[in-house]
């Protein structure tokens, strides 16, 4: 004898077997900056990892962070060393501002973007939806 199931019960059963991550809308979560203050300097230990995760050049990213914090700094290995004392909240806020301005697509909200230069203007080009938005040069 053959058992017949209705569509809704099959769909419910299939959804229950899927992991929780499938239902999350956000797939792009920036790792928080692992920063600490040492003397009169702030050190971000995982700076290059964050830049690699965003698929952006570490030098350009560092330039943005230093400009936003109004300080000087250097990249040494995988760390960014900033002159001055900055709390982890402020550092993470500046990183999130960078993501919103230079990584996430303004149309679809996906992180699949590249910064391309056409003439003298830099654009944030989305590889997912094809949208282009002019961005400030760093």
UniProtKB/Swiss-Prot annotation:
It holds the Pfam family eIF-5_eIF-2B. Signal peptide: none annotated. Keywords: Initiation factor, Protein biosynthesis. Gene3D superfamilies: 3.30.30.170. SUPFAM superfamilies: Translation initiation factor 2 beta, aIF2beta, N-terminal domain (SSF100966), Zinc-binding domain of translation initiation factor 2 beta (SSF75689). The keyword Transcription regulation does not apply. Heterotrimer composed of an alpha, a beta and a gamma chain. eIF-2 functions in the early steps of protein synthesis by forming a ternary complex with GTP and initiator tRNA. This is Translation initiation factor 2 subunit beta. The gene is eif2b.
């Amino acid at each position: 004898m053959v058992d017949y199931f209705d569509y809704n019960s099959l769909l419910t059963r299939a959804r229950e077997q899927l992991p929780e991550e499938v239902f999350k809308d956000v797939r792009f979560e920036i790792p928080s900056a692992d920063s600490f203050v040492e003397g009169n300097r702030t050190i971000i230990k995982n700076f290059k990892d964050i830049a690699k995760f965003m698929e952006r050049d570490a030098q350009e990213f560092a330039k943005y962070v230093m400009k936003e914090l109004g300080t000087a700094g250097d990249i040494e290995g995988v760390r960014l060393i900033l002159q001055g004392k900055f709390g982890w909240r402020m550092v993470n806020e500046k990183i999130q501002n960078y993501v919103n301005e230079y990584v996430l697509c303004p149309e679809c909200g996906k992180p699949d973007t590249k910064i391309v230069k056409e003439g003298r203007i830099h654009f944030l080009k989305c590889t997912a939806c094809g949208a282009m938005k002019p961005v400030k040069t760093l």
